[in-house]
Amino acid sequence: MPSFDVVCEPDMIELKNAIEQSNKEITNRFDFKGSDSRVEQKDEALILFGDDDFKLGQVRDVLINKMAKRNVDVRYLKDDKTETISGDKRKQTMKIQKGITSELAKKVVRIIKDSKIKVQASIQGDAVRVTGGKRDDLQETMALLKKEVTEAPLGFNNFRD
């Protein structure tokens, strides 16, 4: 039986490239000369550094623009906390969302069941497995989920025939 998994994971290679491009632009921009502004990746989080709130906002804008150019959805990032380091310097932590939350998984299953498409959905850890009799039904389900679920970026992998 054909099946696929609904997941919520960013392309980590593209995200890393976006971070590197952001840091390169920040070091080359005139308004950041002499500044200690940068973006770092630590495990499942991004840490943005800026000399003040304005520069921190500029660093965030540069990162979001670079992510958009590399087709990495900005909804993968969740604002965590902003803290003052030393003096006026600011640091903001942004968590990278990986995996589907249980509420979102339940919503995906409910959308699939309410659609009356002849497929079955089951929650498996941080993914939702969708199985069906025909490939066309699975493709219809993918289109439905892309249209209906807007609060989180969904991806589809493990497409088996």
Swiss-Prot record:
GO terms for cellular component: cytosol. GO terms for molecular function: nucleotide binding. It comes from the Bacteria. Keywords: Nucleotide-binding. Coiled coil: none annotated. Nucleotide-binding protein. Belongs to the YajQ family. This is Nucleotide-binding protein Pnec_0318. It comes from Polynucleobacter necessarius subsp. necessarius (strain STIR1).
